């Protein structure tokens, strides 16, 4: 089962970087549009949607029986909160972060004594960082690369194939065409 949690509405500015949505989805709830578009791709999917914000209180019902969490949020506070919840519930988390031309991916696995979001990012960068993303945007192809890497990490983790990016962070610089790994 795939669970999608979001309390946002599709906006025109989402379309250049969120390829799950189409122009006809603008103004619709993201969870409803996401479910419809995913089922259009594969009608055999089992998808549950929750039109609410993911937080400590709502997480109780949302993550029961989940094998893995995928963080697709766009702000520091949410990312930090999701990681804390994942560690509290001992559920692996695939993290992806973006800023303009750069992105990063990491798998946090509480069962393997892995690093956590707070270990890598101990300080909230503050509103200035959030504003820079809002003002300068995020480049669509960078989102595609990071999203694909996150999907690969989910598959590797769930199937025990390959070596997930645990206890390190993989960064991608779209402008330079370079990947770097930090342990």
Regions found by a protein language model. Give the residues of each.
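Adenine nucleotide-associated cytosolic modules
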Residues: 1-183
């Amino acid at each position: 089962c795939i669970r999608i949690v979001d309390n946002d509405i599709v906006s025109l500015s989402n379309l250049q970087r969120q390829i799950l949505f189409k122009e006809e989805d603008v103004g619709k709830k993201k969870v409803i549009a996401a479910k419809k578009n995913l089922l259009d791709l594969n009608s055999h999917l089992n998808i549950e949607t929750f039109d609410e914000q993911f937080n400590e209180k709502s997480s109780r019902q949302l993550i029961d029986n989940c094998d893995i969490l995928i963080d697709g949020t766009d702000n520091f506070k949410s990312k930090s909160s999701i990681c804390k919840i994942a560690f509290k519930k001992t559920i692996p988390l695939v993290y992806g972060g973006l800023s303009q031309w750069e992105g990063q991916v990491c798998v946090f696995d509480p069962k393997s004594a892995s690093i956590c979001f707070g270990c890598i990012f101990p300080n909230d960068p503050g509103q200035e960082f959030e504003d820079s993303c809002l003002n300068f945007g995020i480049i669509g192809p960078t989102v595609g690369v990071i999203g694909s890497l996150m999907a690969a990490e989910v598959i590797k983790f769930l199937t025990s194939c390959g070596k997930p990016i645990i206890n390190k962070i993989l960064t991608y610089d779209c402008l330079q065409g370079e990947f770097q790994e930090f342990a």
